[in-house]
Amino acid sequence: MNKISQTEYNNIVALYNSGLSAQKIGDVYSVYASTIRKILNKCNVQMRDDSHKYRKYTLNENYFDVIDDQNKAYILGLLYADGCNYTKTNMIKLELQERDRDILEKINSKLDSNRVLEYIDLHSKNENWQSTYRLTIVNKHMSQTLNDIGMVPRKSLILEFPTCLEKNLYSHFIRGYIDGDGCIYNGKQKFITCATTKQFCESIINILQDELNIHTYYRDIPVKQDSPTKLLYIGGISKIKTFLDYIYEDAELYIQRKYDTYKSFCHEILYK
């Protein structure tokens, strides 16, 4: 590895923080463990003592083999939106704002994982940045399974709606995606937006039309006319209420602050 990119630096740090030893990371990148240690020291990573390598991490690596319940569908949707799958290193990452730590803890539990969430202190570097928590899973089988489903590397440009889902799980998958990449605006103007690919937008538009008789559309992102990423838009109080009722019905997993926005929206239109 002649020149190491910033992305590779970040991945090496994430792999080490997820529990892999410098030796195993070196095997992945075909370099000596000493080289990995130098990189970690350069990144100011606190090194573990030797006893850490004997720690056993748990994981249900078959969790996504069959998407057959609402929690699997929701987590898959959130991974589609905010997750990364590095198939070269078999590493799956999901990073959310500090205030959303609770949902990461719940996902970690659903995966039967005892990985420790990594705190990323961004706010101290820039007061306009929000610190985050990151869940990192390193498992070849799970990484390959997610890749086969459609959570591929550099997915933001080619993402498509997964074909492995039954219709009764669409709403839970969409809720996960909205929790990751969607915005619910409940001010003077009320609307929902979601940035994704044209193909993904078209799939959701068709689902909403078939399941809810909601007609919506997507448009180019302002100042990015030639971008493959489009902006799905749902407007109108009746459509918004129908859509939110649909994705939150019987929901077990969700980001609390977005669910609170939904409940606030319902309260406002009820007593308007």
Positions of the model-derived regions?
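Internal intein/HINT superfamily modules and their associated LAGLIDADG
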Residues: 1-272
